[in-house]
């Protein structure tokens, strides 16, 4: 049997904020501010991507594309993606600290992995600035 050398953990939506409540709420608010309705199911669809790519994918949904055309009499552009991303970030940063509690057992698993000499890596769809809020003491 091979020895495990490294474990890669996903943070946002898995180790903390299981279920991705913080970004989903921020996506819904950011789109709503532009007069666009996105369902919770639709908002969850592209989870795992960078957040700007996630927003771009939501714009590609037929329902969102049609709403945008009806509201603005034009097709959406990359400028619209960036505009919603800025609103998304504002909402996410405002609520992120509420969703930083690790799921039960995560801290203990990390401590055991460290004791056993197993390297720990991480991945996330959050930016570095977002992770600095989620895991302010992540080095320890």
List the predicted regions and their residue ranges:
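N-terminal helical cap/lid subdomain that shapes the substrate entry/recognition surface
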Residues: 2-107, 111, 115-119, 129-132
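Conserved phosphate-coupling serine/threonine residues in phosphotransfer and NTP-handling enzymes
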Residues: 124-126
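Conserved small/polar residues in nucleotide/adenosyl-binding loops
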Residues: 140
């Amino acid at each position: 049997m091979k020895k495990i050398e490294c474990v890669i953990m996903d943070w946002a939506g898995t180790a903390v904020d299981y279920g991705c409540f913080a970004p989903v709420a921020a996506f819904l608010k950011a789109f709503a501010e532009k007069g666009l309705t996105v369902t919770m199911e639709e908002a969850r669809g592209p989870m795992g991507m960078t957040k700007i790519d996630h927003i771009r994918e939501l714009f590609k949904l037929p329902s969102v594309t049609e709403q945008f055309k009806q509201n603005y009499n034009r097709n959406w552009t990359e400028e619209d993606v960036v505009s919603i991303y800025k609103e998304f970030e504002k909402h996410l940063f405002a609520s992120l600290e509420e969703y930083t509690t690790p799921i039960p057992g995560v801290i203990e698993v990390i401590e055991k992995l460290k004791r056993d000499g197993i390297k720990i890596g991480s991945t996330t769809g959050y930016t570095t600035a977002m992770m600095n809020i989620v895991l302010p003491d992540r080095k320890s």
